[in-house]
Swiss-Prot record:
Transmembrane feature ranges: 16-36, 60-80, 115-135
Keyword Transmembrane helix recorded: yes
GO cellular component: TIM23 mitochondrial import inner membrane translocase complex
Any single biological process term in GO: protein import into mitochondrial matrix
Protein name in UniProt: Probable mitochondrial import inner membrane translocase subunit Tim17 4
Protein species of origin: Drosophila melanogaster (Fruit fly)
Organism superkingdom: Eukaryota
Length: 224
C-alpha cells in the first residue's frame, strides 16, 4: 500500500495536475526544439519559430496528458474501491483501461491495441519499481549487518589494551593505599599529644601503642 499518496477523491485531481505539468514542460521543450529546427535560416527566425510552435501545440499536449492522468487515476480509484486493496494489479488494469477508453473513437481494434500497450507499459513500470525496492531493501539489510559487525568489533578490545587497563587499575589501587597510609600516619601524629594529656600519670608503656608499619597496612588492605 502506498502511504505517500493522497486519498482517492483528491488523488484524481493530484494526478491530473501532475500529468498536466509533465505535458507542459516536456511538450514545451520538444516543440521548441522542433520549431527551432524547422524554422527558416537565421537565429531570430529560429527563436521565433520555436516560440510559435510552443504556443500552438503545447496546450494540446498538456491537455492530453491531463486527460490521461485523470482517466488513469479514476480507474485506479474504482479498482481500489472494488478490490479493497492497493497493489500492482490496480495500476496494470488501470493502464489497460485508460488506453482502451482514450482510443474508443478509433474502433475496437485500436482500443485493443492501445489497451495492450497501456497494460504492457504499466506492467514494466511496476516491475521496475518492485526490482528497485528489492535492491534497496537488500542493500539496507547488508548495511545493517555491516554496522552490527563494526559495533561488535569496536566493543571487543585487544588484549594489550586489557593488560594496560589492568596495570593502570593496579597502580591506582596502590596509590590509594599509600594515600590511606599517609593519612593514617598523620592522624596518629595529631592524636599523640591529646593522648599524652588525657592519660597523664600512667605508664608510658601502656599509653603508647605500637604504630602500624606500611607493610602491615598493605597486608590489611589485601593488596598482597
Amino acid at each position: 500500500m502506498e502511504y505517500n499518496r493522497q486519498p482517492c477523491p483528491i488523488r484524481i485531481v493530484e494526478d491530473c495536475g501532475c500529468a498536466f505539468m509533465m505535458g507542459t514542460m516536456g511538450g514545451s521543450l520538444f516543440q521548441y526544439l522542433k520549431g527551432f529546427r524547422n524554422a527558416p535560416s537565421g537565429l531570430r527566425r529560429g527563436l521565433h519559430g520555436g516560440i510559435e510552435s510552443v504556443r500552438l501545440r503545447t496546450p494540446a499536449i498538456a491537455g492530453s496528458f491531463a486527460i490521461w492522468g485523470a482517466t488513469f487515476s479514476t480507474v485506479d480509484c474504482v479498482m481500489v474501491s472494488y478490490r479493497q486493496r492497493e497493489d500492482s494489479w490496480n495500476a496494470i488494469v488501470s493502464g489497460a483501461a485508460t488506453g482502451g477508453i482514450l482510443a474508443a473513437r478509433n474502433g475496437i481494434r485500436a482500443m485493443a491495441n492501445s489497451a495492450f500497450v497501456g497494460c504492457l507499459v504499466l506492467a514494466m513500470l511496476e516491475g521496475a519499481g518492485a526490482a528497485v525496492a528489492t535492491i534497496y531493501a537488500s542493500d539496507g539489510g547488508v548495511k545493517a549487518e555491516e554496522s552490527l559487525i563494526t559495533v561488535d568489533q569496536q566493543m571487543q578490545r585487544p588484549q594489550w589494551e586489557t593488560s594496560v587497563a589492568d596495570s593502570n587499575l593496579t597502580g591506582a589501587e596502590l596509590e590509594r593505599v599509600l594515600d590511606e597510609c599517609r593519612a593514617y600516619r598523620a592522624h596518629n601524629k595529631m592524636q599523640q599529644p591529646m593522648r599524652s594529656d588525657a592519660v597523664e600519670g600512667k605508664e608510658l608503656g601502656q599509653l603508647m601503642k605500637p604504630m602500624h608499619s606500611l607493610v602491615d597496612l598493605v597486608k590489611l588492605a589485601e593488596i598482597v
